[in-house]
Curated annotation (Swiss-Prot):
<comment type="pathway">
    <text>Polyol metabolism; glycerol degradation via glycerol kinase pathway; glycerone phosphate from sn-glycerol 3-phosphate (anaerobic route): step 1/1.</text>
</comment>
<dbReference type="GO" id="GO:0009331">
    <property type="term" value="C:glycerol-3-phosphate dehydrogenase (FAD) complex"/>
</dbReference>
<comment type="similarity">
    <text>Belongs to the anaerobic G-3-P dehydrogenase subunit B family.</text>
</comment>
<dbReference type="Pfam" id="PF00890">
    <property type="entry name" value="FAD_binding_2"/>
</dbReference>
<dbReference type="GO" id="GO:0019563">
    <property type="term" value="P:glycerol catabolic process"/>
</dbReference>
<protein>
    <recommendedName>
        <fullName>Anaerobic glycerol-3-phosphate dehydrogenase subunit B</fullName>
        <ecNumber>1.1.5.3</ecNumber>
    </recommendedName>
</protein>
<keyword id="KW-0285">Flavoprotein</keyword>
<keyword id="KW-0560">Oxidoreductase</keyword>
<keyword id="KW-0288">FMN</keyword>
<dbReference type="InterPro" id="IPR003953">
    <property type="entry name" value="FAD-dep_OxRdtase_2_FAD-bd"/>
</dbReference>
<dbReference type="InterPro" id="IPR036188">
    <property type="entry name" value="FAD/NAD-bd_sf"/>
</dbReference>
<dbReference type="InterPro" id="IPR009158">
    <property type="entry name" value="G3P_DH_GlpB_su"/>
</dbReference>
<dbReference type="GO" id="GO:0004368">
    <property type="term" value="F:glycerol-3-phosphate dehydrogenase (quinone) activity"/>
</dbReference>
<comment type="function">
    <text>Conversion of glycerol 3-phosphate to dihydroxyacetone. Uses fumarate or nitrate as electron acceptor.</text>
</comment>
<comment type="subunit">
    <text>Composed of a catalytic GlpA/B dimer and of membrane bound GlpC.</text>
</comment>
Amino acid sequence: MKFDTVIIGGGLAGILCGLKLTQRGLRCAIVSRGQSALHFSSGSLDLLGALPDGSAVDTPLMALQNPDALPAEHPYRLVGTDNIARLADETETLLATCGPRLRGHARQNHQRVTPLGMLRPAWLSPEEVPVAPIQSQRVCVVGISGFLDFQAHLAAASLRNQGISADTAEIELPELDVLRDNASEFRAVNIARFLDNDDKWPLLFDALQPLSQGCDALYMPACFGLADNRLWRWLSDRLACALYLLPTLPPSVPGIRLHNQLQRQFIAQGGVWMAGDEVKKVTLDNGVVSALWTRNHGDIPLRPRFVVLASGSFFSNGLISTREGIREAVLGLDVRQNPSRADWYQSDFFAPQPWQQFGVITDNTLRPQLSGSPVDNLYAIGSVLGGFDPIALGCGGGVCAITALYAAEQICQRAGGEQ
């Protein structure tokens, strides 16, 4: 099977890269082994929330105008900080065409409310997520009886510590008893599959309407809206106050919705999605990937002109940790890491951890190295890359998006895709 590009990994970076390639008329396939890390995410994306010295960033593009703001190995530096604004704008446009209703802009971070009632900088967030300022609001944080993946009292306590008037309430929704009887089934995704049915919408409205009479905003767990946010908009038009949704413990409804919307658009544009498959072997000829062999296709190789590695970090098994060191799982590419295991971590759990910056080494076109030499038709994108700490710097989503579109640009220029 011949393709212009095969992407290994179906997470945020892989899909965004595939979307741009298929828009440019290239034949593209994504080999996806399992669930994307988006299924475990808040549905918000960050671009740059802090600098290495710990100082907060309010205006990411302005901060990136200083070429020394980030270390030389950071993916933003490899891509070129002068390209970030253009690629961020392109990301926002691309996401909008896929269906997600997101708010925010790369020029200015907003502060989103987290499930614990704290504030965290973000670039893009679903429109139903509450953002600062909220000091003047009387907030009621609403839980669902028996639902353990969202703790309303913890969120309310954090809000009160910030000087916000916050109370809690709980709704019953007896119709959910069929799920409530089994704690392992009483999860946000299963609740959403029930509540997203149009005939169930009034049940939720009837439970929330009395609470909406006595406050300025209701915060409740994001346990509906798997396909879109039509139910949230329907409720917002009818309740007596604003309604906002907070992500729950995984699996996350906003994250799954974002992934599904991007996946549907990729397939609609002619992309091939190989679900539940895994690249088991890679054939290299003179420093060029000539064939990929996957679990499901047996002795039928995929023969791409270009390959994109978007296999993720440790969480997605794109990087593997052993006693001997860190290795990249598919090709054994060169990896940035500290030689001594004692230097992998800080004893303070909440301090920036060195291992977060481990990952594949690339040149400034995002071509990775194998035994010190670049692989000519291979690109690495997203969280498999080394040189950045997505937690401490608040840049995980941005690195995925920016590197995905940048690699797609390199491929289009070389492959002759429509510009």
